[in-house]
């Protein structure tokens, strides 16, 4: 089978010539026409008979595939192109967009479901300062800070979280992004100017993000973090609970540091609500601000569970809130 990439329809005579010189049947020359969206490619290949040829060559019975659901998705994608919403993705690896591919696709999934195309503004947090903050973020309807490690660009992320909180702009913090939200809130709402994460500062008197107790003696790297799927219990009356529509969820994790329980009550007392915890209540899994349009942080990685036809509830809720800002 030859699948031929082409920007224009493959003429029949060219198809016959390729088949002749490559010693394959004519119906085994499959044009792969340039599509306006990647999600349209399965429909185009089915139209050209790829599945039928594969089934014949493998000796499998070829039924009639039901592509209606996928066709509806593609139709929805094209319909969403009429409306746009800009989300700032503030990270430290933004020069390589594929570093955040799962996050970008999750925003695309959510945007499609909400009838809008999400335009990502890639912001390198290392270059974000108090001087250029407003100019950089003023055109955005939402701000997302994704996961990451190391202290490079951390202060820029904190500035972005502060801007979102104070300006009422929807914010979604994922893993490190949730920790950034807690640090920012502790500094500027709780009044602890030196608040930080123990990962980035060994001298802060307010390590609102600290190493998890069971990670204290771990020195080996690679596969030693809190990894994989864990349950999370959502508090009633929170945006998180509303987004998911259920009390208990299971999400995928990859981290060593957590919101410190030492400062938890004090931070909650000034307005940062713990929206989700581990079943025993010890680990903070989600935080949010009740009187903000959407200021939500999660310690887990929701982008790993988003699908084209089933956008993740947190991304969907975030995009809905961003659209409401327009």
Region locations from a protein language model:
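N-terminal beta1-alpha1 cap of cysteine-dependent amidohydrolase-like domains
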Residues: 1-291, 299-326
């Amino acid at each position: 089978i030859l699948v031929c990439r082409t920007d224009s329809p493959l003429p029949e005579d060219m198809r016959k010539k390729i088949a002749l010189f490559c010693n394959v049947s004519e119906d085994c020359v499959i044009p792969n026409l340039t599509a306006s969206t990647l999600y349209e490619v399965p429909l185009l290949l089915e139209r050209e008979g790829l599945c039928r040829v594969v089934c014949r060559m493998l000796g499998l019975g070829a039924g009639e595939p039901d592509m209606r659901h996928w066709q509806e998705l593609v139709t929805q994608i094209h319909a969403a192109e009429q409306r746009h919403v800009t989300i700032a993705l503030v990270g430290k690896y933004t020069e390589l967009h594929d570093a955040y591919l799962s996050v970008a696709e999750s925003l695309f999934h959510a945007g499609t479901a909400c009838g809008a195309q999400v335009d990502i503004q890639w912001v390198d947090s290392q270059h974000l300062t108090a001087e250029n903050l407003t100019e950089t973020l003023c055109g955005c309807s939402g701000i997302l800070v994704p996961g990451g490690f190391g202290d490079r660009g951390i202060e820029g992320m904190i500035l972005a979280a502060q801007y979102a909180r104070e300006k009422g702009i929807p914010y979604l913090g994922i893993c490190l992004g949730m920790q950034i939200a807690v640090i920012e809130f502790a500094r500027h709402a709780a009044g602890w100017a030196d608040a930080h994460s123990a990962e980035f500062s060994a001298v802060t008197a307010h390590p609102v993000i600290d190493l998890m107790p069971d990670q204290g003696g771990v020195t080996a790297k690679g596969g030693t973090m809190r990894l994989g799927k864990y349950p999370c219990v959502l508090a009633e009356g929170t945006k998180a609970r509303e987004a998911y529509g259920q009390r208990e969820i299971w999400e995928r994790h990859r981290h060593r540091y957590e919101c410190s329980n030492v400062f938890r009550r004090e931070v909650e007392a000034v307005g940062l609500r713990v929206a989700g915890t581990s079943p025993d209540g010890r680990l903070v899994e989600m935080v949010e601000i009740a009187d903000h349009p959407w200021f939500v942080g999660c310690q887990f990685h929701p982008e790993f569970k988003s699908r084209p036809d089933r956008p993740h509830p947190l991304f969907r809720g975030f995009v809905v809130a961003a659209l409401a800002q327009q």
